[in-house]
Amino acid sequence: MGEYRQPRDIEIVKFMLWNYDFSKKTDIRAITAEFAIFEDIQVNALQGTLVLYDAVDLIQEFPIIGEETIEIEFRVPGEKTSIKGSFRIYKISNRQRGKTDTGQLYVLYFVSNEYYKNLQVKVKKSFRDMPVSKMVEKVFENYLVEKSNISNVWPPKKLLTNEESATQQTIVIPNLNPFGAIKFLADRAESVDNKSSTYTFYEDHNGFHFTTFESFMEQEPVHTYNYEPSNIDTKNPNTVGTKDRRDA
């Protein structure tokens, strides 16, 4: 069975909040009540939330206006390396105040910096006589990789997986943002390895990937799931009960 962990088992190494022009920063570990980071192979960039219990009115004094950068680093027990990344704050929830104290609770919503860069530029370019996977690499490097001089906050990310596509093609990208351009290219790609056209472009906590769904199915499973009808106990057919379970 896989090891079950409580949220408190996670070691928080860094929660550093920078203001919009990087002229000021503050450590918010002490006021972070909850955080979550979401990975999805059908979503291009990481997303997440931070729940802050603010008893020092940081939202006014810093201030937090929804254009900040958050540096996150945490460590899972038993893992050799920490998980870290820098993200853009794009939304702040309504504030909730307690009845018996002066603290206030609110949520900061964040996304990867590449999502912001994606909104700022367009790709209007022709690629000639090259595989689609190479075109995707060029779009990623030229339009999404952070080239800011604030390298300690925005270390450049990598396209860790770029599954090779078949045949040389000539394709004109018609003025799309980078994520749209990669989707446009993905729809025209066929894998060398499995003759599949199910390419997807996504980010996980390690970096970005351009790969097919068939490649996922060839990987070793992380968990084994057993499924049985929800209203029948196979050990005792006369008993009704939920039998979905996961073995890890």
Would you name each region that the model predicts?
Residues 101-246:
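Charged- and aromatic-enriched interaction segments used to assemble
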Residues 1-122:
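Assembly/oligomerization scaffold segments
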